[in-house]
UniProtKB/Swiss-Prot annotation:
GO terms for biological process: copper ion homeostasis; mitochondrial electron transport, succinate to ubiquinone; mitochondrial respiratory chain complex II assembly; protein-FAD linkage; tricarboxylic acid cycle. This is Succinate dehydrogenase assembly factor 2-A, mitochondrial. It holds the Pfam family Sdh5. Its main location: mitochondrion. Belongs to the SDHAF2 family. Plays an essential role in the assembly of succinate dehydrogenase (SDH), an enzyme complex (also referred to as respiratory complex II) that is a component of both the tricarboxylic acid (TCA) cycle and the mitochondrial electron transport chain, and which couples the oxidation of succinate to fumarate with the reduction of ubiquinone (coenzyme Q) to ubiquinol. Required for flavinylation (covalent attachment of FAD) of the flavoprotein subunit of the SDH catalytic dimer. It comes from the Eukaryota. Residues 1-30 form a transit peptide. Signal peptide: none annotated. Keywords: Chaperone, Mitochondrion, Transit peptide. Interacts with the flavoprotein subunit within the SDH catalytic dimer.
Amino acid sequence: MLRQLKLTLNISRWIFMPWQRQASASSSQVPPFLAPISDDVIVDYEDPDYLPLPEYPVRPNEPLETRKQRLLYQSRKRGMLENDLLLSTFAAKYLKDFSAEQTAIYDQLINGVSNDWDIYYWATEVKPTPEEYNTEIMKLLKEHVKNAERVTRFRQPDLT
C-alpha cells in the first residue's frame, strides 16, 4: 500500500508540477514512461504480413471528368490533416490540367499506397520514394510541397 502511494505521488508530481520535471530531468530519476522523446525520430513500422491489404479497384471505363472529381474529393478527405492540406491544394492547382495518363498516375499514387504517412514522407523528402511511385506527378508534388511561392496553406481551398 505504501509503495502504491509513493508511486502515485511521484507520478502526480510529474504531471502537476512541471517545474520539478526539469530539475530532475538531468538526473537519472526520470521514469521510463516519462522519458523525453526526441523530435527528430520518425516512428515508422513495417506493415505486418498477416494484415491483408485490400486491392484498390481499377476503373478502366470511368470518364475522365468523373475520375478527376473523385480524385479531388479523395485528395481532400485523406484522414490526416497534413495530407489533406498538401493534396487538396495540389489537386486544386494541377488536377484540372492533367491528361488522362497523368490522372491515372495520380490515382495510383494516392490510392495505391496503403499508408498515407508514406505519401507524406515521400512528398516532404524525409524518406526516399520507391521507384514505382517516383513519377512526374510525384516530382510535381514534391515541388508543390516546397512551396516556392510561400503560399499560406492553413486550410483547404474552396470548391468551385
